[in-house]
């Protein structure tokens, strides 16, 4: 596959994630957009690793590290959101002022 096509795809995914993160008012949607951003970064790591030196696995190892961080975020994020929902009865970002109490 051509490098430019993959980079355009990654930039498109990253832009969608940033747009969704900025405009979302729901915490669940913000977490999903954050996952989209992390996946765009993974695509870049693997693409540049394959394009510049396919014998070394630096980009692939970084990608596995980012996937592990995303898995931890996917496990801890909903637990925090359910706790916030239990206490505040809402998952809206603009309604939750957690530093108030």
UniProtKB/Swiss-Prot annotation:
It is a multi-pass membrane protein. Gene3D superfamilies: 1.10.287.3510. Signal peptide: none annotated. It is found in: Plastid, Chloroplast thylakoid membrane. It comes from the Eukaryota. GO terms for cellular component: chloroplast thylakoid membrane; NADH dehydrogenase complex. The keyword Methyltransferase does not apply. InterPro entries: NADH_UbQ_OxRdtase_chain4L/K, NUOK/Mnh_C1-like. Its EC number is 7.1.1.-. One of its GO terms (biological process) is photosynthesis, light reaction. It catalyses: a plastoquinone + NADH + (n+1) H(+)(in) = a plastoquinol + NAD(+) + n H(+)(out); a plastoquinone + NADPH + (n+1) H(+)(in) = a plastoquinol + NADP(+) + n H(+)(out). Keywords: Chloroplast, Membrane, NAD, NADP, Plastid, Plastoquinone, Quinone, Thylakoid, Translocase, Transmembrane, Transmembrane helix, Transport. One of its GO terms (molecular function) is oxidoreductase activity, acting on NAD(P)H, quinone or similar compound as acceptor. The chain crosses the membrane at residues 2-22, 32-52, 61-81. NDH shuttles electrons from NAD(P)H:plastoquinone, via FMN and iron-sulfur (Fe-S) centers, to quinones in the photosynthetic chain and possibly in a chloroplast respiratory chain. The immediate electron acceptor for the enzyme in this species is believed to be plastoquinone. Couples the redox reaction to proton translocation, and thus conserves the redox energy in a proton gradient. PANTHER family: NADH-UBIQUINONE OXIDOREDUCTASE CHAIN 4L (PTHR11434:SF16), NADH-UBIQUINONE OXIDOREDUCTASE SUBUNIT ND4L (PTHR11434). Belongs to the complex I subunit 4L family. NDH is composed of at least 16 different subunits, 5 of which are encoded in the nucleus. This is NAD(P)H-quinone oxidoreductase subunit 4L, chloroplastic. The lineage of its organism: Eukaryota, Viridiplantae, Streptophyta, Embryophyta, Tracheophyta.
